[in-house]
């Protein structure tokens, strides 16, 4: 597909030619190879993204001079399982798929590389940039996150101020006040004050706070550029703007990462207004760090 603002071409690639993706490129070459963004699946949603958000973002970025590859990981969407990788873990297989996608982009004339994804795609993106020095930036939409002291105050505080809640507790019809109060106290004092991981992730898959911090420190040392976007779909884990920065107080994360908090938006950006917000934020971040006038 070709028009005045972008061209799109489908590719089969990978070790077994089992991966399928669509490369979107800007119409005219600039002074050098265009930067490129690899969009990574969110769960089992194929390469168009939730509510076609990846398609929208890829075309918006093409208008800013960037290439994009929307592709399916092994066994998802149009991609099949590889014939020669049956002995590796799913996590390792997905990282090899991402490596293959980045190599394809470079063969097609793409310059600086960026990875992007929503939810599990964000988590895969963070792993990919940490293990692959070819990648200069990452866009992380509703990624894994740690709760903080303030998270619990924001979460429980309004409930503790409701007269009806206290009345039920005083009349013996509810234990919720005591339970909430004990939870708040335990989380904001003593050894429980450290940031805590998302309880929905198993202990075998969730990184520790120290591991996550070490990964961020490595990326900061390399000069990587990160964009974190959190939506209202993640309020049970992320409920105020600076929670990410508060979770890592020893890091100067603000110097390397930009943060957007969209509490009105849902997790899949289902409304046009939410998609417009995300598109504008991503384009602004791209222009600042990777666009034609960005400082290298």
Language-model region placement:
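Alpha/beta-hydrolase active-site loop
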Residues: 86-108, 127
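Glycine-rich "HGGG/HGxG" loop immediately N-terminal to the catalytic nucleophile
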Residues: 71-88
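N-terminal cap/lid segment of alpha/beta-hydrolase-fold proteins
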Residues: 1-35, 271
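Aromatic pocket-lining residues of Rossmann-like dinucleotide-binding sites
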Residues: 61, 128-129
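Short glycine-enriched, charge-decorated loop/helix-capping segments at active-site entrances
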Residues: 53-54, 83-89, 275-276
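Short, surface-exposed "cap/lid" segments of acyl-processing enzymes
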Residues: 26-72, 236
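The alpha/beta-hydrolase serine catalytic core
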Residues: 89, 134-279, 285
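Gly/Ala-rich beta-loop-alpha elbow adjacent to hydrolase catalytic centers
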Residues: 116-125
């Amino acid at each position: 597909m070709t028009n005045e603002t972008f061209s799109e071409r489908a590719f089969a690639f990978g070790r077994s030619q089992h991966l399928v993706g669509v490369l979107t490129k800007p119409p005219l070459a600039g002074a050098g190879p265009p930067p490129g963004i690899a969009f990574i699946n969110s769960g089992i949603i194929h390469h168009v993204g939730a509510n076609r958000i990846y398609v929208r973002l890829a075309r918006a970025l093409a208008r800013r001079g960037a290439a994009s590859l929307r592709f399916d990981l092994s066994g998802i969407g149009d991609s099949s399982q590889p014939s020669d990788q049956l002995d590796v873990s799913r996590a390792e297989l997905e990282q090899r798929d991402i490596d293959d996608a980045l190599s394809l982009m470079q063969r097609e004339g793409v310059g600086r590389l960026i990875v992007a994804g929503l939810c599990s795609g964000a988590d895969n993106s963070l792993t990919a940039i940490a293990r692959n020095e070819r990648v200069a930036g990452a866009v992380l939409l509703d990624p894994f996150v740690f709760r903080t002291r303030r998270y619990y105050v924001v979460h429980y505080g309004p409930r503790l101020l409701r007269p009806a809640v206290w009345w039920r507790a005083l009349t013996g019809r509810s234990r919720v006040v005591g339970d909430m109060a004990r939870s708040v106290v335990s989380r904001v004092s003593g050894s429980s004050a450290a940031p805590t991981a998302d309880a929905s992730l198993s202990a075998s898959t969730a990184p520790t706070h120290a591991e996550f911090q070490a990964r961020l420190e490595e990326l900061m040392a390399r000069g990587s550029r990160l964009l974190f976007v959190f939506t209202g779909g993640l309020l049970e884990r992320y409920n105020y703007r600076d929670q990410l920065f508060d979770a890592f107080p020893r890091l100067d994360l603000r110097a390397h990462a930009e943060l957007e908090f969209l509490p009105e938006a849902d997790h899949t950006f289902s409304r046009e207004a939410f998609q417009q917000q995300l598109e504008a934020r991503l384009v602004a971040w791209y222009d600042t760090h990777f666009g034609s006038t960005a400082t290298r």
